[in-house]
């Protein structure tokens, strides 16, 4: 038993030393190898359900289909007894609200029934559920220095990510398990000096088309740790 403890301690020491020497790019490759070992994201074609529960217990259920190979995206949302279906085919967009493509300006404003919002939601879901693979997209700037940091009493390897101005202005931090390289937390700031933005804790894993995706994402404000809600993937 004593020998096993010594071996494990030595393993952790060498693993930690190796992790400290990783560059941002090397860390990204290791976490992608954990989440998408067969490079399935490139031609991803599948669907999944996301149940969002806000802090005040409001529920929104979304059936999402992502077809990167054919540049298709669709989302069917049920909220407050209303059903919205959105489909994007390359640059074309169609919205159906409660079974009709015709709806009032009041409904359009209240339920955000615009193609601008549809493209925004497509980008949102393909980004978050495409992580960490999406960090290889053009315009992404990886900090070459990987840091070790404790977050909520747990130690992580942390990768800082910014973007070219044409892509985005937020600053992101991605927290990876130092043993498995699994992505377990991410955090973003609009203005880091103000401690704004949010952090998202990832729990459990669901495998979709060979890709390990987070089953539960819980959202909190950076400034006061206020709980905002969670998404559950099925």
Residue ranges and their predicted role:
Residues 26, 30-101, 140, 147:
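N-terminal mature ectodomain segment of secretory-pathway/periplasmic proteins
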Residues 54-62, 80-86, 101-104, 166-171, ...:
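Short, surface-exposed beta-strand/loop "edge" segments at domain boundaries and coil↔beta transitions
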Residues 1-24:
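Bacterial Sec-dependent N-terminal signal peptides
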